[in-house]
Amino acid sequence: MTISIETLRELRHEFHRFPELGFQEKQTKIKIASFLKAKGLEVVEGVGVVGILKSGKDTKTIGLRADMDALPIQETSKHPYSSTYPGVMHACGHDGHMTMLLGAAEELAHSLDFDGTVIFIFQPNEENGLGAKAMLDEDLLSKFPMSDIFALHNLPGIETGHLLTRKGLICSSESLFEIRLKGQGGHASMPHVGRDTISVGSEIIQSLQNIISKRLPPGSGSVLSVTEFISDGARNVLPGTSLIKGDVRSRNEEDRLEIKRLMNKIVEGISRAHEIDSHVSFETEFVETINSADQTETVIKVAEELGLNFNGNCEPMSFSEDFAHFSNVVPGCLFLLGNGQSGHGSDPLHSSSYDFNDNLLPIGVKVWSSLVRKLLPKSGMQA
């Protein structure tokens, strides 16, 4: 490996100190573009950053993707490289994802021991499910036609460097819902005069819990979570309006649409019974992420050849990934690398104490570089 572990660490810590939210990754993009240009790559900038590296005469092209955005979370860890921006931190490891892909770009630019073209894709705003679509809207795939596309994500609680993937469904979809209730507010001592939306909202919330347990098949893997319940009431004021928000995860479109149908039916029925108005919105930004068979087999072979511990038929993940918008168009594979089982790197994703495990950086670089050499072998080299 041509890039040192210390250089990888420094690069990752620099990203960690200066996190930027989705579609605000201005300085992050500047750093990435400068790094790639310094290594001799052609760089195209738009909503994201794309690096192009060619070697040999083969026209085959593959894409490797990393996400760039941070989260609106106040970091509680006290590392020397902790976030310098109040209320913003890299709590999902995108600092590490960027670093590993940049490390692979340097490694491959130095060796050029492959035949074809590699497109290094640095994507904004993964956390809100909008970044991949924004790059597709800029005609990423027509400008850079690819035969395969890949992405990785770190996974705390799993042995460092342990690789997990599977053919078919790898990540659930995510749908966000809002239920707006409008009744008649009033004095807390005279509930019969008004139409209280808190009691109606509570009844709706309880009924929603029956969708997964009673209406979908056991083992569906779907999750419905109510995450917010807001009203305009006060200590002695019954609310006239309430807002219920939540999150749905599904493993297939059929279940997702059935949850949406039942939610609308429950809200309409309970609201009508209590003579209040209601409105439901149900929006899906993250669709299910599906891994293609051939690309997944290639990732598994790379893990075998590198001597990594791996599981090539892991359980589908309940979280969501907007890499799905790429892999729905180009055959692809998302795989996971363990971030550590204890100590450094084991805290959950999206927690204020989370930190990417620096020991994973060289492993990720090796996986990316080996994947390129496997898919784009030089003449005379074993594929």
Language model: regions and residue ranges:
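General beta-strand structural signal in soluble alpha/beta enzymes
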Residues: 44-46, 120-122, 150-152, 312, ...
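Acidic/His- and Gly-rich active-site-bordering loop/insert found
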Residues: 1-90, 102, 106-114
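Non-cysteine beta-strand/loop elements that form the S-adenosyl-L-methionine
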Residues: 63-65, 74, 177, 334-340
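Divalent metal-coordination and catalytic microenvironments
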Residues: 15, 64, 94, 120, ...
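Metal-dependent amide/peptide-bond hydrolase catalytic core
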Residues: 38, 202-383
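Alpha-helical transmembrane segments that form the membrane-embedded catalytic/substrate-binding core
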Residues: 97-101
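Histidine/acidic-residue-rich, glycine-tolerant segments that coordinate divalent metal ions
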Residues: 49, 71-73, 79-89, 95-96, ...
